[in-house]
Amino acid sequence: MTLRIFDTGTRTLRDFKPVQPGHASVYLCGATPQSSPHIGHVRSAVAFDILRRWLMAKGLDVAFVRNVTDIDDKILTKASENGRPWWEWVSTYEREFTWTYNTLGVLPPSTEPRATGHVTQMIEYMQRLIDNGFAYAVDGSVYFDVAAWSKAEGSDYGSLSGNRVEDMEQGEPDNFGKRGPQDFALWKAAKPGEPSWPTPWGDGRPGWHLECSAMATYYLGEQFDIHCGGLDLQFPHHENEIAQAHAAGDKFANYWMHNHWVTMAGEKMSKSLGNVLAVPEMLKQVRPVELRYYLGSAHYRSVLEYSESALSEAAVGYRRIESFLERVGDVEVGEWTPGFEAAMDEDIAVPKALAEIHNAVREGNAALDKGDREAAKKLASSVRAMTGVLGFDPVEWGSDAGADGKADKALDVLISSELERRATARAEKNWTVADEVRDRLADAGIEVVDTADGATWKLQ
């Protein structure tokens, strides 16, 4: 069967035809580690981890790039407000994102580039845009000329988001020599006290959109298969990525996939609304594998409305699968059902795929009740194949001293690192930093216990 993907760019289901037969190239907009990850962030990681696993299951060699935006305005602002170096701030939260990905069984990317490590590629990209007449330098900053590009032959600016050029606002100040209000920064001139890198146009730091265009094409080539990300990135970020790439002469991504939001009481989960749920807090209620099951259970293009009852129902659903496999005993991974394959090939329709799994579980339990262990074992093998594709095969999760043990080990590594930073601060009599570490851990439901032998921790 042929995988069909809903391409945001054309708003249609399209047959997936990779640029290079037998291979798939995928770029996912990853974390901006300005603060702790919440389940809104993690839903995107789980959704496209499932996509990646399905591509692999279909026999494709997958190059999966997930970037880290390790420099931007919010990072600098928050680091400054808390009296910490920007790079230390980033490192702290990047570790939290990595722990979260690992705890929920998200496969490590083939490459995880950081923006600050690719300034050379960004300079080359800006030079191409300037040479092509679609970018200009002003007082150390470099801007993309939206008007020039939108009038150029072959321009498709606005097609991804459906916005008209005259209605677009980039959020960039208009008083820094921009030619037009829609123009956006490729490079931001250095400001006192901020990190900067040298370029032919002056010292400064990267613009958000430039980072991804430069890194995606550097690792995956000027034309690659799939670009993924959250729906909120569609404009301006992804729209501007496309503009930069096409204006530079790159074909860029053939397919665009966007996951919808996690909402609570009908509102998008966001830090500004104060309705975010941190992963450690949620792991007090369910195991990591059950949280993964929940986050992946809705279609990636559908809103995932959070409630405690929905989370509990998901955990019960997973335990039903787990219980069946425990009843059967040891079985090898078999083959998925035709219905499962059809569901996954139709734009990664996980709800339909889960229905196939639960049908097999019901039939398997019925077979066991009748004493037909061979039929039950065959169904269990199929269940393992299907749950493996979705990243929650109970046997695999159970093989590492249980999912709880896996989470505890990862959590201990993360918190121990923070306790070491606190111990250093206390030794230097930097009580502000020491208290900040303690308070931030407390906000995540972790109590620091000081003993004669040093600090330890426990869940509140």
From Swiss-Prot:
Q: Where in the cell is it found?
A: Cytoplasm
Keyword Protein biosynthesis, does the record have it? yes
Which EC numbers characterise this protein's activity in its record?
Answer: 6.1.1.16
Give the co-factor note.
Binds 1 zinc ion per subunit.
Protein name per Swiss-Prot or TrEMBL: Cysteine--tRNA ligase
The record's gene field reads cysS
Taxonomic source organism: Corynebacterium glutamicum (strain R)
Give the molecular function GO annotations.
Answer: ATP binding; cysteine-tRNA ligase activity; zinc ion binding
Q: How does it assemble?
A: Monomer.
